[in-house]
A protein has these predicted regions:
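Post-Walker A helix-loop "phosphate-sensing" segment adjacent to the P-loop in P-loop NTPases
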Residues: 29-35, 251-256
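Conserved Walker A/P-loop ATP-binding site and its immediately adjacent core
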Residues: 19-24, 34-57, 62-63, 70, ...
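A solvent-exposed, charged loop/short amphipathic helix patch at secondary-structure junctions
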Residues: 109-131, 135, 190-205
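Pre-Walker A (Motif I) flank of P-loop NTPase domains
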Residues: 4-10, 36, 89, 226-228
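Hydrophobic residues on the short alpha-helix immediately C-terminal to a glycine-rich phosphate/catalytic loop
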Residues: 13, 24-29, 50, 215, ...
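Inter-lobe coupling linker of SF2 helicases/translocases
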Residues: 76-121, 135-139, 143-176, 184-186, ...
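Walker A/P-loop
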Residues: 5-25
Length: 319
């Protein structure tokens, strides 16, 4: 999968050796020149085990394992320069530490501007529909527009006031990320005109997931290809149809663009079906509730997912 695609999704059941597989994959990518400086990030509770597993598998490997002291305010700049200026076989750190790495402000500006453009397009479509649009839907999009404008203003200020001594992710030369327990980053921002549809999740997303998008886009721009990251999880999709779309948003932006899928609504129009049911609310009244309940065009969607996914179950490992 890594040699053919340059990344993807490891949909591996818990207990099937995911940690060792990840360490071997990172080292082999470096050895085969598929990546020059791979990075592994994991949960704070697991990251020491990941580093120990890597070191046990490859005792002579040059690993940079980030300690809590390395990410103290006094040492952080020196540590970032250490990543930038040295040719490590692998850099290993926790999710929280990864979130403290500055991202390229110019790239942030481009991504946030693209998100804002999509919101403005959605607002224009809704305004043209006139009376058929709920006030809540308009209000939600206008709030999202305001939040994106505030983020853009902050990034523009960072560009103007930037000093040359700040090393960001782009300058570090990381060209592949292995993300252990990748479901921790599933709450990525997305744009939609759907209002009060159950099961969509929070379209605003989290800053943690947005930072991951910035990092992955940095790698994709450097290589000129999709992927550039490997997601490893036992629960890649748990409780929302949007989670599948967001995996593609992270990893397959060029392919989505080729299919003219530029937002969640365009994807849902092709691959998901919305139903309307009558349910009891908290006050025991019957209310109408919309939700995305089914995937449609399942063979095409499965093929799209399987192109970049490696499956492993306990039964398949003889467990």
């Amino acid at each position: 999968m890594l040699k053919q695609n340059g990344g993807g999704i490891c949909d591996h059941e818990v207990g099937t050796g995911k940690t060792l597989i990840m360490c071997i994959a990172a080292h082999e990518m470096k050895r085969l020149n598929l990546a020059h400086k791979p990075m592994i990030i994991g949960l704070k509770a697991n990251v020491a085990e990941i580093a120990a597993t890597y070191q046990a598998a490859y005792p002579n490997a040059r690993i940079l394992y980030a300690s809590e002291k390395d990410f103290s305010t006094a040492n952080r700049v020196r540590f970032f320069n250490n990543i930038k200026n040295n040719d490590y076989d692998c850099v290993i750190m926790s999710h929280d530490q990864f979130g403290k790495i500055p991202q390229s402000p110019e790239l942030q500006q481009r991504i946030l501007q693209a998100e804002l453009d999509t919101v403005e397009e959605n607002l224009e479509v809704l305004r043209q529909q006139g009376k058929n649009v709920s006030r809540a839907m308009l209000k939600g999009l206008e709030k999202r527009k305001h939040n994106l404008e505030a983020k853009l203003e902050k990034v523009e200020h960072a560009i103007k006031s930037r000093t040359d001594d700040v090393v960001d992710f782009k300058q570090m030369g990381i060209d592949h990320i292995f993300i252990d327990e990748s479901h921790q980053f599933k709450n990525l921002t997305f744009n939609t005109r759907h209002d009060r549809v159950a099961g969509l999740g929070n379209s605003e997303g989290s800053q943690k997931a947005l930072n991951m998008l910035f990092a992955i886009r940095t790698i994709q721009e450097r290589t000129g290809k999709d992927l550039g990251a490997t997601f490893l999880s036992g629960t890649t999709i748990s409780n929302s149809l949007t989670e599948l779309y967001l995996l593609f948003k992270y990893l397959r932006p060029k392919e989505l663009e080729r299919q003219d899928i530029r937002c969640f609504d365009a994807w849902a129009a092709i691959f998901a079906k919305k139903t309307t049911d009558f349910e009891f609310n908290v006050t025991n009244n019957v209310v109408q509730k919309e939700r995305f309940r089914y995937f449609i065009k399942v063979p095409e969607l499965a093929a799209f997912y399987n192109e970049i996914t490696d499956y492993r179950t306990g039964g398949g490992c003889g467990r």
